[in-house]
């Protein structure tokens, strides 16, 4: 979270920013190392993904978005650089993440194939209904097309 002067490599942020970074520069070496570190942590987490790297003692498994880096990042690298060998290198990472989600789904006795069973951060989202206070801001309504 660069807006918070964060120092950890949050996987959700890396997943979201990887396409932009890869568009602007050659990120292959950087993200190859990042993927290697992800894979090392994934082995410790039984197929789950860490929330950040380096994983400094926080052994909770990531939820959706943060963990989805296992599939999105390899796809981003393939999209921008077309390296099939990197995709082959990433296949165990991707497969173990998908299998982890599948096992979690099955453990609940459901087969929804929807990853909605772990904690997510979402600290900036209010998913549980409207707030009693308006957060509109001070911009004059005539300048806002959606108001």
What are these regions (language model features)?
Residues 1-52, 61, 80-144:
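Active-site acid/base region of carbohydrate-active enzymes
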Residues 17, 70-79:
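Alpha-helical scaffold elements that line and support the substrate/ligand-binding pocket
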